[in-house]
């Protein structure tokens, strides 16, 4: 089945019965992020600011923190872009065909991508997380070592000196129960992370994934009962018994490091930040003896893109 894309400038393709999920609160660590300019020693300052946008149509709250690192002893300027906020889950029953058949739209993946146009002088030099993550929680403190490099400390220490490095005020943290993070082929112009559904236990049965199959019951990922006497729309698993990302959404917390030559003639850079949600179509139908489930992958893609302008001389980032 052909994938259909929903962007922030088009109308939604789901039926009107799907309501927008309330956007969950961003991680409470936001209140600990200090904005303004900080002198971290060795002739180096860190200037931090934030930008917030809300794509109501697609249920995406984008919060970007940025930190310019100005090390007068180094020939390049650095910018750390931290992408946070919330991508709503939108786990919703979207269709009913009588009592015996119904469809559920559910989020199988969340994505964040940053991309520099090919003609930009600036380059992506690093990113966190740097690898794929399959644990429930990820945490890393970003530090600067006065050598032109930002590094991540996965012990999650906050503030002060960490070895020979100094914290720049950012500790990344996010949770992904029943999902895993995949780093998507980074280059010096593009980096992205895909947080994709892995598998899940359904009421002590399973685990089941997007491809699970039983010859009698089909895919049982979101099947509440195998033989229950209820409408199909009432036989989907309650969201409070599934991964929190399905109903409450995903709160990303990724970081990208951009470098810029101090001697470059043009000290302005454009960068695109893209948030995305991929949804599968899970169907239940009654076979005359039992319920049977099917799952169609990647049925809907909801995308929200924002272009930001970086001014390296003024140490400002705007949208």
From Swiss-Prot:
Which UniProt keywords are listed?
A: Cytolysis, Hemolysis, Secreted, Signal, Toxin, Virulence
Any single GO CC term annotated in Swiss-Prot or TrEMBL for this entry: extracellular region
**The keyword Signal is annotated on this UniProt entry:** yes
Q: Name one GO molecular function term.
A: toxin activity
Where can this protein be found?
Secreted
Q: Which Gene3D superfamilies match?
A: Leukocidin/porin MspA
When this gene is knocked out, what is seen?
Answer: About 10-fold decrease in virulence in mice, increased presence of neutrophils in the injection region.
Its Gene Ontology biological processes? Answer: cytolysis in another organism
User: Would the keyword Nucleotide-binding turn up in this protein's UniProt record?
Assistant: no
Q: Where is the signal peptide?
A: 1-26
The record's annotation in InterPro entries points to: Aerolysin/haemolysin_CS, Bi-component_toxin_staph, Leukocidin/Hemolysin_toxin, Leukocidin/porin_MspA_sf
Record's note on what induces expression: Less protein is secreted in a secG or double secG/secY2 mutant (at protein level).
Q: Which family does it belong to?
A: Belongs to the aerolysin family.
According to the record's subunit comment, the protein's assembly and interactions are: Self-assembles to form first a non-lytic oligomeric intermediate and then, a mushroom-shaped homoheptamer structure of 100 Angstroms in length and up to 100 Angstroms in diameter.
Job of this protein: Alpha-toxin binds to the membrane of eukaryotic cells resulting in the release of low-molecular weight molecules and leading to an eventual osmotic lysis. Inhibits host neutrophil chemotaxis to the lesion region. Heptamer oligomerization and pore formation is required for lytic activity.
Q: What is known of its domains?
A: The mushroom-shaped heptamer is composed of a cap domain (comprising 7 beta sandwiches and the amino latches of each protomer), 7 rim regions whose protruding strands may interact with the membrane bilayer, and the stem domain (52 Angstroms in length, 26 Angstroms in diameter) which forms the transmembrane pore.
Indicate what this protein is called per its UniProt record: Alpha-hemolysin
């Amino acid at each position: 089945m052909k994938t259909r894309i929903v962007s922030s400038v088009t109308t939604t393709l789901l039926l009107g019965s799907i309501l927008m999920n309330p956007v969950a609160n961003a991680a409470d660590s936001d209140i600990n992020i200090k904005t303004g300019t900080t002198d971290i020693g060795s002739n180096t300052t860190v200037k931090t600011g934030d930008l917030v946008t809300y794509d109501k149509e697609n249920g995406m709250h984008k919060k970007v923190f940025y930190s310019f690192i100005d090390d007068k002893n180094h020939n390049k300027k650095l910018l750390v872009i931290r992408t946070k906020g919330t991508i709503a889950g939108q786990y919703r029953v979207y269709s009913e065909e009588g009592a015996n058949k119904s469809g559920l739209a559910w989020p199988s993946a969340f994505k964040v991508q940053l991309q520099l146009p090919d003609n930009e002088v600036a380059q992506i030099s690093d990113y966190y997380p740097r690898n794929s993550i399959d644990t429930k929680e990820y945490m890393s403190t970003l530090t600067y070592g006065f050598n032109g490099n930002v590094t991540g400390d996965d012990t999650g220490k906050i503030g002060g000196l960490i070895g020979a490095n100094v914290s720049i005020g950012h500790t990344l943290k996010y949770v992904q129960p029943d999902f895993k993070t995949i780093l998507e082929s980074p280059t010096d112009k593009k980096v992205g992370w895909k947080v994709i559904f892995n598998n899940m236990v359904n009421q002590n049965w399973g685990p089941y994934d997007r491809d699970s199959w039983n010859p009698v019951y089909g895919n049982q990922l979101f099947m509440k009962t195998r033989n229950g006497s209820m409408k199909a729309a009432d036989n989907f698993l309650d969201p409070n018994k599934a991964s929190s990302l399905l109903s409450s959404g995903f709160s990303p917390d990724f970081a990208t490091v951009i470098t810029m030559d101090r001697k470059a003639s043009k000290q302005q850079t454009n960068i695109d930040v893209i948030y995305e949600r991929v949804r599968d179509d899970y169907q239940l139908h009654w076979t005359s003896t039992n319920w049977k489930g099917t799952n169609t992958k990647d049925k809907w893609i909801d995308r929200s893109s924002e272009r930001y302008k970086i001014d390296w001389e003024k140490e400002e980032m705007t949208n």
